A protein has these predicted regions:
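Short, extreme N-terminal segment that most often corresponds to the first beta-strand
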Residues: 1-16
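Alpha-helical interaction segments
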Residues: 10, 31, 49, 71-77
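Generic structural motif
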Residues: 8-11, 26, 38, 80
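Acidic, aromatic-enriched beta-alpha/helix-loop junctions
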Residues: 24-68
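Short, surface-exposed coil-to-beta transition loops
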Residues: 14-19, 28-30
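Short, compact, well-ordered microdomains
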Residues: 60-101
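N-terminal phosphate-binding or glycine-rich loops at protein starts, especially the Walker A/P-loop
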Residues: 6, 21-24
Length: 101
């Protein structure tokens, strides 16, 4: 497994600011957590379900090729960083429900 973080410099309110992804041996997404500027979190894959929201296309071997100066930066992160974010996402309501908590 590999873990990556995409950070968007100027997201709109309905676009994720940070996207944490877990990739399998074929560089396909198996789990993802999206953090939005307004504080919402969305998690996909594993116990959160919604696998159809995961990227069907494999990520490039060198994720730095996804970097676009002034728009998005991509980098590999440690497995523990992803697990911490994943666990936090599991403890939070996501989407519409977070308005009530």
């Amino acid at each position: 497994m590999r873990y990556i973080l995409l950070e968007y410099d100027h997201p709109q309110e309905d676009e994720a600011k940070q996207v944490y992804s877990e990739l399998d041996r074929e560089n396909r997404e198996t789990r993802r957590v999206e953090l939005y500027p307004n504080g919402l979190w969305f998690a996909y894959g594993d116990e959160h379900g919604r696998e159809e929201a995961l990227s069907a296309d494999p990520f490039p071997e060198d994720v730095r090729t996804l970097n676009v100066p002034g728009e998005v930066s991509a980098r590999t992160i440690a497995p523990g960083v992803f697990r911490e974010v994943w666990d936090q996402a599991a403890e939070r309501p996501d989407g519409f429900l977070s308005m009530f908590f």
